[in-house]
Structures are given as C-alpha cells and as structure tokens.
Amino acid sequence: MNFAERRKQVFEKMEKQSALILFSGIESHVSADEYAPFEADRNFFYLTGLRRDHMILLMKKTLKEEQVILFIEEADPTQERWYGRKVTVDEAKEISSIENVMFLDSFEGAVDRMMAREDIDSLYFDCYRYQFEDMPDYNMIKAKEFAEKYPGHAVKNISQVIAELRMQKDGDEVALVREAIGITDKALQYVMKHLEPGMAEYQAQADFEYMIRYNGAEGTAFPTIAGSGANGTMLHYDTNLDICEDGSLLLMDLGAKYRGYCADITRTYPVNGTYTERQRQVYDIVLAANREVAKTAKPGMTLKELNEIAKKVLAAGCMKLGLIEKEDEIDTYYMHGVSHHLGIDVHDVTAACNDTLQPGAIITDEPGLYIDEWEIGIRIEDDLLITENGCECLSEAIIRDPDEIEAFMKDR
C-alpha cells in the first residue's frame, strides 16, 4: 500500500508552519501483570502500515519543506527474550516508506528543537472521539499534554482529514477486504455444516473462529454475535451461552480480520436446517430489503437515504403480515441503520463534511426485523463496494437465499 501517498494527501490539508503528531498507542493494563492484546491507533496504521506499540509519527510542514520522522523503540534484549522481537529500523523503513527513522528516546528533544525554531504555529493531533466513547484515547491525552506544554501554539484536530481519505478505499484495501470476506465465507460454510439442535451458541461461535484462524485471518473483526431464538432480537448480544433449540433460528453477526481490514457479515440460519413458515415469511421481507439496498446504492447517495429505502420495504412486508398498520410503526421492529462504512474499523470513520457515497467506499447492507413476540430476530448483512455507476456486492458468494441455505444444510 502507498503510505507515502497517503501522507502526501494529509500534508496537502495541513496549514503551513504546522506539525502533525500521531501515536500508535500503548498497551492497555488489565490486572496484575496482564495486558490486553495491543491494537494500534487506526489512523497511525493508515499512514504508516505499522501496528506496534510505542511508536510516534511526526509530520512537519514549514514554509520551506515537508519532513516525516518515525520514532520507534530501540531493541532491548531482555524485553525481547520475554515478549518477542521489536520492529527494526530497516523493517520500519520498508513497511512505512519513511527514510528518517529514529529511536523513541530522541522524540522529546526533536520536538523541543522544532518548537524552539519558531517555524511551527500549530500542532495537529488525532482527536477523533467515537459517539459511544466516554473516555479519551491515548492520542487525545497526549494532545492535552502538548497543549499545556506549548501554550502559545494552536492545537488542531486532524481526524476529519484522515477520515475523508479513509472513506475511499484504494485497490489494495479492497483486495484485503475481499480476502477477509472470503475467509468469512469459508468459516460460515463450516458453521452451517455443523449447526444442529442442542448445540450451544458458543460452539457455533467456536466453529467460526477456529475456521477463520485456520484460513489465515489474524482474528475476528469484532466480538462474534451468535444469538439463537429470542437472543437474535438483541442487536449486539454476544454472551453466546444459550442452547440452540430445535425449530429456532441462529443469528450470527461476525467477520474475519485480515492484515488489518475487516469483514462484517450477518446470516440467520435455521438450527435444524429448515425455516418454519413464519420464519420464512419474515426472512423473505428482510432479504427483499437487503436486495433493494444493493440495487439502489450508488455514488451521490447518503446512508440515510439507503436506510429510508430499507424501511419502506420492511414496513410494507410487516403491514402484510399484520404486525403494523402504518409505515411509521416499523421502528417497533427495526431500530438501527441499514449501513455503515467498513474498512480498518468495522464501523469505519466518516467525515462529517461529506456524507455522500463516492466510488471506492465500502459500506454494509444490513436490514433486519426483531419480533420479540415471535422470538424471531433476522438480519442479513452484506458488504458493498461503491463503483462508478452503482455498487458491487463483495459478499455475493456467501449464500443468503433461504432455499440455498436449506439445501446446503441438508447436504451435510
């Protein structure tokens, strides 16, 4: 991937006499000497290709030049004996295409010298805050520290600039998402072959997660949802402890992660291999909405417009079943959006200044119906690549037609 080109695009949006400082992050402490698996800051990864802790990217733009410096930890033989090898200077250069790589202990001095020369007026940080987060991330904490240390300099947010770039995937990124989806497909076939009454939800989850790792994924894109029966009506249920009963459905919302890029797929399977008449009626409504979104999505549209299209199809179907009397009552059974962007994050970033779809965007297509009184939760989710004239369903090969699902599960 062309990380140098991405940095060039960021430089174009930065003001002169400014600097961008991005931190990869640090380990998250759990308890005693236990740390959570490290996840690098996604924007740091996007601009460098590196996903290790304790790294810093410095991009400086003055009146005369643009300069990029990468700071990494120096190798410590004792630490490496316990925790594995660090990225070397040569490896960091090769991955990131950054020639100027220095060790981390020189970072503060480099910044102090840069600020003392009086050719920097403002500092950019990644101050993105997801709508559900109530705690600042590491980059936000560091931004506050720098604002206090250098009070005469403006602190600015670069997150929307990078978000706008991330919304349009290049060919390399699309290829990685395709691979993540392909691995997800193989794992779902394995799940369907083994799903049967009496299984625990966590066993279906285990079948999926075993197969994605076996086929080369680095792990799941997000915690696997495996909700059977009434649990399928809970949008983000991930306890996955109940038994899959005969005659019930199993809703699985899941995805593989491959080289940093995510798949996000939902399929709803009959536990015993055959949908009941009522389940089939609801399934057909959701599938019709899924197909209508895929048929309609194109450049210039917004996710809100796609959601309204899905709601109309779902509402019409629910009125035919007698579940609702008016179209605006559909919120009783469908209470989320039909789409979000997909990429490095499963709920990938969006730029507030530009919410219309452009070629290269990858979005989800995930209508659903959640009917508590029938203990039926059905969601069908695919991943769409927006093209010049419409869209391509990247997950088309993952079977969703109910006849095909029943035939596949019967032949096992």
Residue map of PLM features:
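Active-site neighborhoods and metal-handling regions in enzymes and metal-associated proteins
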Residues: M1-R412
